[in-house]
């Protein structure tokens, strides 16, 4: 290599040939070759497929280095929440969303810069004080993304009470699908049909098929929220 240490100012990773660096001002984004040509394993057929995502990776990098204020996602903690899946974290990074953690019991208010608060699979319920803070945050225009389901220790009464303000009522038990077209392997591992909107369009375009195992039942009240 002509400049063997050039990439060290941009990344700590081992740099492969044909990797890229996008830079603008004080910001930069390293694009690994494996993020340009993405290899995925099919565990059912024991085969691998390779797809080209260079356009998506470069577009994301350009957006990152040229955007002054990036969206701020705060991930709630303190209730035995599970770690975010790696593919989910990778997608968040690709969308240039910065992540932070949020522990509500030692703050007086939710940070003003929080664009979205994510509640991901808590194993214990939120306190009434925490729910009040989240409710006020949402009333002031904040956004909540809640991914929660059945827990071993019972229901998440306070959290589900918060959701009822927005027309979502939970049911006891899990959803079991009777239509073979809408589950994989077992009737409790759901294959949802995705409608087109700004959240799901990228999944549809890239031919992702999310599965939802052990899903909590919900009743949607159109008259609420």
Locations of regions flagged by a protein language model:
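Short, surface-exposed patches at the edges or C-terminal ends of soluble domains, predominantly
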Residues: 1-225
